């Protein structure tokens, strides 16, 4: 194999630039030509492909985001769009494609390979940690530590004001960010999609702890585990606590 291309697809994740750097330098050291694809599958379809060298990836290992940029490409679900992408690669003599992304990106990569004979390597890059066959995906550890930082700061304010903090975190249908950050941050309650819970029972428990003198609690909610405003209302009404919602998103 003499030529490969690299793209980042879907949501960006911490560590993508370090991964790009490693791929580019390793491939060049192995005698390959390396091409970058701007804006994921969208760029692949629109032929936004350029040659990279070792200088292209200087001073990026410490940067967040992705220097290749990323974008959603809904048209990639159509076979004719995927064929156009494959034709763009073949026209440049590119024999292999490295896809850094999550489950949606991997689905697109599989179709691209199965239908058009493109050699594809997938590198799991998503904060959600929702891909099999790897303990941790690129970006997950940073996401957990970012949430932990927020929880630690919120607890100080919630304790000062005798409030309950409901912290909603990312993760889609996977509760790993909520679980890991909640445990590390000492949250009293962690709500994840994988485990059913009774919010009324939780609210009653908060009420009892309040009567015993505990005036502050942290609830960490994974985004796929329920509606934060509905949970806030139930907890407020049953426990009588002042509940504040904090949604952690693109930070």
Per-region residue spans from a language model:
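Gly-rich Lys/Arg/Thr-decorated short loops/hinges at beta-loop-alpha junctions or inter-strand turns
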Residues: 4-6, 60-72, 125-135, 160-162, ...
């Amino acid at each position: 194999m003499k030529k490969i291309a690299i793209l980042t697809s879907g949501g960006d994740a911490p560590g993508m630039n370090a991964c790009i750097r490693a791929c580019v330098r390793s491939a060049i050291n192995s005698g390959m030509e390396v091409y970058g694809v701007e804006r994921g599958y969208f760029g692949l379809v629109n032929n936004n492909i350029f040659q990279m060298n070792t200088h292209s990836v200087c001073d990026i290992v410490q940067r967040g985001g992705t220097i290749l940029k990323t974008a959603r490409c809904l048209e990639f679900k159509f076979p004719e769009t995927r064929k156009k992408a494959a034709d763009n690669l073949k026209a440049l003599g590119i024999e292999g494609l490295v896809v850094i992304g999550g489950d949606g990106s991997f689905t697109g990569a599989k179709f691209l390979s199965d239908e058009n004979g493109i050699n594809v390597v997938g590198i799991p890059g998503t904060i959600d940690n929702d891909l099999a066959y790897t303990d941790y995906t690129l970006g997950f550890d940073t996401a957990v530590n970012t949430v932990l930082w927020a929880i630690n700061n919120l607890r100080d304010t919630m304790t000062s004001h005798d409030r309950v903090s409901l912290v909603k975190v990312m993760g889609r249908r996977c509760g790993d960010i909520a679980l890991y950050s909640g445990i590390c941050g000492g949250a009293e309650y962690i709500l994840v999609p994988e485990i059913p819970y009774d919010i009324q029972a939780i609210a009653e428990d908060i009420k009892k702890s309040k009567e015993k003198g505990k005036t502050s609690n942290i609830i960490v909610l994974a985004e796929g585990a329920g509606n934060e405003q509905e949970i806030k209302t139930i907890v407020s009404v049953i426990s009588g606590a002042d509940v504040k919602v904090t949604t952690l998103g693109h930070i």
